[in-house]
Amino acid sequence: MCSIGEDDFGDEGAAHAMVVEALPLGIVLSPGNCSKCDVNSGELYKLNFRAAECRECFLTYARHKFRAALGAAKILPRNAEVLLVLDGSAKSLVLLDMLHFAQTQNQFKRLHCNARVVYVEEQQVQDRDPVDLEALLSLSVQYAPFDFYVIELGQGCSLQRIKDYSPSLKANNELIHKLQKLQSLTARQDYLQQQRKNLICSVAQSLQCTHVFEPNISVDLATQLLTAIALGRGASAALDVALLDDRLSGDVKLLRPLKDLSEQEIQFYIHAQRLKPLFQSGSHYGMERGPTASLQNLTSAFVANLQHNYASTVSTVFRTGDKIAVNSDPEQATCVHCQSALDSELSDTLLAIEYSRSVSEAGVSLYKNGQDLESLAKKRLEMQDGLCHACRAIQAELESGNLL
């Protein structure tokens, strides 16, 4: 397969210093000639730093990004067992449509893999109405012969074929009860993300899939990179934005084949293929509480503002993550919850955080017992609890019970 060329198929290629063209962006409904094939079209698509093109040329361009991402690194073996994660968002439908198209090509152009689809039902956790089952069933018919499954977040043993699925009772969802024990929205969102990743890994193992396709695009990866650093997972931030994330248990590999697509390209693809997302973008847990409610919300709002005003900056942010070296030491200990690398040495910053926490917990007794708080802070950091700094912060917020 070919790889992405900067001039034609990068997010902005070498156009980071270019002045934005004065031509209108978006779908031009007036007829015109395609700049690629010179065919007159009644609907032209105008992307940033690209000339207006017809529907067929745009779809070819977008699908090439998907194929090139997988082909450049040659990380998907022939006839691999693939699990595609569907959450009902526009980007997950684009990934489903692109994979289905790649599977229905002739023998030479066909993407040789065996795909299954799992819909992760999160509506219970988000306290929203359940997904429209009829719309989900119609998707399974439209994208046959893919096998469709449904699993509910917080219900570990709820994997069912879509034709057999029936929603479970909200009162039995253990994840909802554990989220209620966490004090801050930052901790809830972080814990929910890690639980979701671990759930998808368990589904892949039960279906004997070696690779998982996740529908993250460039703006998602830029947000994930900054969030990981802010939460204290900087040592593993590179894997949060990489095409291949091999931290999952059971030798399951997580792939992000849409990493080079922008939000604008996703919306254009949805329009071109007349796809109907099950949910609107920005419907993640806790997003409705505003940008200042959590660290994740604030980071997402910051990146969204960058995307709106300085489109090429977002590409620069997440591509910086690709340049961060990953610690490939096989003996490096990892967090038992999020699989991030554990700190091998005591950090002055972490020591200061634990010292501050010790002072807060000691309170008025600090003047009575005169205990060495610095030694206490060091002892806490040296405890072999198997958790990274970010997961220890979640554990500290739990009113009762264990993180795992």
Curated annotation (Swiss-Prot):
Biological processes annotated in GO: protein urmylation; tRNA thio-modification; tRNA wobble position uridine thiolation; tRNA wobble uridine modification
SUPFAM superfamilies: Adenine nucleotide alpha hydrolases-like
Chief location bin: cytoplasm
GO MF term set: nucleotidyltransferase activity; sulfurtransferase activity; tRNA binding
Pathway: tRNA modification; 5-methoxycarbonylmethyl-2-thiouridine-tRNA biosynthesis
Domain of life: Eukaryota
GO cellular component, one term: cytosol
Keywords: Cytoplasm, tRNA processing
Localization, UniProt: Cytoplasm
Biological role: Plays a central role in 2-thiolation of mcm(5)S(2)U at tRNA wobble positions of tRNA(Lys), tRNA(Glu) and tRNA(Gln). May act by forming a heterodimer with NCS6/CTU1 that ligates sulfur from thiocarboxylated URM1 onto the uridine of tRNAs at wobble position.
UniProt family annotation: Belongs to the CTU2/NCS2 family.
Matching PANTHER family: CYTOPLASMIC TRNA 2-THIOLATION PROTEIN 2 (PTHR20882:SF14)
Database matches in HAMAP family: CTU2 (MF_03054)
Protein name: Cytoplasmic tRNA 2-thiolation protein 2
